[in-house]
Amino acid sequence: MTVTAAALAALPASLLAIWALRKTPAARYVVAAPRADRWHTRSTPLLGGSGIFAGMLVAAGIAVATHVIPASRELGGILGGCGILFLAGLVDDVYRLPPLAKLAAQGGAAALVIWSGVRVQIISNNIAATALAVVWLLGMTNAFNLLDNMDGLAASLATIGCAFFAIDAFTIHPDTMIALLALAVCFGCLGFLPYNLRLRRPASVFMGDSGSQVLGFALGSLGLASSWTVAGSTVATLVLPLLVLAVPILDTSLVTIVRLLEGRPVTQGGRDHTSHRLVYEGLSDKRAVVLLSGVSAALGLTSLAYKVLDDTRITLLGVLITFAFLLQFGSYLADVNRPAASDRAPSFLASLLVHRRRLVEVVVDFLLISASFT
């Protein structure tokens, strides 16, 4: 049996698990009800995360049982961390966990992965490397939690991201465990998408926190294990996870900065994400998802090209130009007027919004000038 064949088992496992769960009483009680600060307009079961995680476990179990991959400590750490967040997310979907409890679960999952041996090797100082790994894992976990704000968005971006991690693990930096996990998450998401991204109807199932946190943590772990543990140029090792996951990073940064500037709590829900702003600009929900997925795929292809090229100067220049473009894109979206925007008087920080575009242009010029001297 091959890695791909073992991982492919995640697809029917996810499909069947979600189908079966929809027939249970949980489909009526574990639901996301419509709210003023949420995008959906009808109560929807929060069962998708169970299917995605079930697919991951089935694929990994088959791969280990058939000796496609060994039962390694790293594999156990990543799956164990995902398991912690799946359970915490499931409790949150049913009872609503306080933010500190969710953060504690995320910290425990990150500690388990780091204990298993997945570390940042591009930094020699162990304390700094551990701190960076924790920040990265928690950041990606919460980024996907925030990104799960429109039908099909989080699962589509996770599918694309995992596909590029798998390509890297099959070709550039061969690693069967990373390839298996990336494909397992990818196929698990593909089993979920028929329920969540339907052509002419709204989603019949959401992934919930039990799905979004698992996806974010899994992708963060894959980023650490597949790239940041590889010796070599710092730029080359950073390029894949940073570009493949640039859209979630952009969305989280945009939401955080704008809410702080407007004097609103960062943890408060809202209809002010990247996807929502694209809809306010005239796109349909599905076209917004397709556009962001296309951007993610283009960035993934770019990252692979840089890794194959293996030229630090060209890669650095390309990455700086890419992030300069993303800064401009984020600045443009931040200026989009929201129908339900707050009527409160602007805070001192909010007054800076008037000059945001000029500030971004200065930053972009600085990045490009700096890159020209590398």
Predicted feature residues:
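Select subsegments of transmembrane alpha-helices in polytopic membrane proteins
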Residues: S43-A54, A154-A155, S210-Q213, S284-G294, ...
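Alpha-helical membrane-protein architecture signal
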Residues: W136-G139, R271, S275, R356
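Mobile late-domain/C-terminal helix-loop "cap" segments
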Residues: L243, P265-V308
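Cytosolic, membrane-interface loops and tails of multi-pass inner-membrane proteins
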Residues: W19-P45, R201-P202, L254-L283, R338-L352
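"…together with the soluble PPM/PP2C metallo-phosphatase catalytic core" -> "…together
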Residues: M1-T252
